[in-house]
Design a protein with these regions (language model features):
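Generic non-transmembrane alpha-helical segments
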Residues: 1, 70-78, 124, 128-131, ...
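ATP-binding N-lobe of GHMP and related small-molecule kinases
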Residues: 1-94, 114, 118-123, 159-162, ...
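DPxDG-like acidic metal-binding loop motif
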Residues: 68, 96-122, 127, 138
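Glycine-rich beta-strand-to-loop/alpha-helix junction loops that act as flexible
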Residues: 100-101, 241-246
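Glycine/threonine-rich beta-strand-loop-alpha-helix active-site module
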Residues: 117-156
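Conserved, helical-rich catalytic subdomain that frames metal- and/or nucleotide-binding sites
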Residues: 141-142, 146-238, 253-263, 268-271
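Short hydrophobic/aromatic beta-strand micro-patches
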Residues: 249-251
């Protein structure tokens, strides 16, 4: 079975409070990016082994710790399925805040549900995905969602992006860990929620829709801040860092002219 694991962007990211379990309550809007994805081939095999091959972008991670393998192992533990062969063509940059690894994990759960005819509902697959990451359940539904709690409490939301252009830019030599992102943030309660703000014209988003990680990440990684400024210089109506970074995105009325080089990864698509 061939499956495309689409990545996502975050429109706004409010860090509301630190919880007793060590996680943070957040509010964010996740939007799928249809044209930027990892390609994964999944097949059932005899026995109970998990075979994993990876091509494309090189990720310095032992196979047993890869989210694809962890997702397959979770499905074996819960449902007693047989072996699984996974071939991952990695195209989504990692350490970017685009959810590439989470999308891969969810794709494995969805694929195994189909090839082993488990009959799981989307709700059940989302519960399983939540065991592998806070944003992982989003990729079961693959539609715009406002996400609360750790990110796993999701409600569909209309985001007026159809027909507009999206540019995703990641500095290749800059990565931001989740620990670094949360380590420098001060939780706060915003005056206006994202559900209200995203319903305003996109030209107004710059005034109110923010990513709470940006101030300290930009201070520690000036190159990331420079890319956001570049997106506005190129004519973006709205630009922001996605998730915990280091990727940024810009929303444009017309196709922007942004070229990639040895220093940056660039993806452009019409939404």
């Amino acid at each position: 079975m061939q499956i495309k694991a689409h990545c996502k962007i975050n429109i706004g990211l409010n860090i509301l409070r630190r919880r007793e379990d060590g996680y943070h309550d957040i509010e964010t809007i996740m939007v799928p990016v249809r044209g930027l994805y990892d390609e994964i081939e999944v097949a059932a095999t005899e026995g109970d082994s998990i075979a994993f091959e990876q091509s494309g972008i090189v990720v310095d991670c032992p196979a047993e710790k890869n989210l694809c393998v962890r997702a397959a192992r979770l499905m074996q533990e819960r449902y007693g399925i047989g072996g699984v062969s996974i071939k991952l063509d990695k195209r989504v940059p990692f350490g970017a805040g685009l959810g590439g690894g989470s999308a891969d994990a969810t794709a494995i759960i969805v694929a195994i549900n189909e090839i082993y005819a488990l009959g799981l509902t989307k709700e059940r697959m989302a519960e399983l995905a939540a065991e592998l990451g806070s944003d992982t359940p989003f990729f079961v539904y693959d539609e715009a969602m406002i996400c609360r709690g750790r990110g796993e409490v999701m409600t569909p939301i209309e985001v007026p992006l159809r027909g507009l252009w999206l540019a995703v830019v990641k500095p290749m030599n800059e990565g931001v860990s989740t620990a670094e992102a949360y380590g420098g943030v001060t939780p706060r309660l915003p005056e206006r929620g994202l559900e209200e703000l995203v319903s305003t014209p996109i030209s107004k988003w710059r005034e109110g829709i923010v990513n709470d990680f940006e101030p300290h990440i930009f201070k520690a990684h000036p190159r990331i801040a420079e890319i956001k400024a570049m997106l506005y210089d190129k004519g973006a109506t709205y630009a922001a860092m996605s998730g915990s970074g280091s990727a940024l995105f810009g929303i444009f009325e017309e196709r922007p002219t942004i070229t990639d080089d040895d220093d940056t990864f660039v993806h452009i698509e019409q939404m």
